[in-house]
Amino acid sequence: MKAAVIQEIGTPLAIEDIPDPEPGLSDLILKVGACGICGTDLHMSENKDPNVGWRMMHPGCVMGHEFAGEVMEVGREAKQHWNPGDRVTALPWIGCGECPACQAGLGYRCPNVISRATPDLPGAYAEYCRVGARETIRLPGQVSFREGALVEPLAVGFNAVR
């Protein structure tokens, strides 16, 4: 599949062929319908100081954590709740599902969380991406993929003032 990949921090992204994602037992594979460009993506892709910001940006990294798309594949343990063709958005991580934080619905506090834009979980600046079924939100029919890609940044703003 095609993806926009970091070649070197501070240089433009390059379109490359990378392997298609494969679903884990409780994962979904999405065909990306829309993906936003977050200010964090811009800052991280330009940051050459290893002591500032996330250290996950590296050559070969695929960013993109504000996205929506269509479910194409469903992992065996997710088939009860998800089907190919479902229109969704997802959180920018996959939690383990087992720890107290995940059990309480606080996957972002999971000690084993896998964050998007890392080697283990490439982002959505690609044709397809892998998401955790627990971290996925179904989009109503009247919500476009472009609007669905705004769910994550809208949630950040909402929770900031809540």
Residue spans for each PLM region:
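Extreme N-terminal starter segment of soluble prokaryotic enzymes
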Residues: 1-2
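Residue-level signal for short segments within beta-strands and strand-turn junctions
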Residues: 5-7, 46, 73-75, 103
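Short N-terminal binding/cap micro-motifs at the start of the first secondary-structure element
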Residues: 10-15, 39-40
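Glycine-rich beta-strand-centered segment in the early N-terminal region that forms part
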Residues: 21-36, 50-100, 140-142
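Cytochrome P450 core scaffold surrounding the K-helix E-X-X-R motif
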Residues: 40-46
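Short, solvent-exposed secondary-structure boundary/capping segments
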Residues: 42, 81, 110-111
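NAD(P)H dinucleotide-binding glycine-rich loop of Rossmann-like/cofactor-binding domains
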Residues: 54-56, 65, 94-162
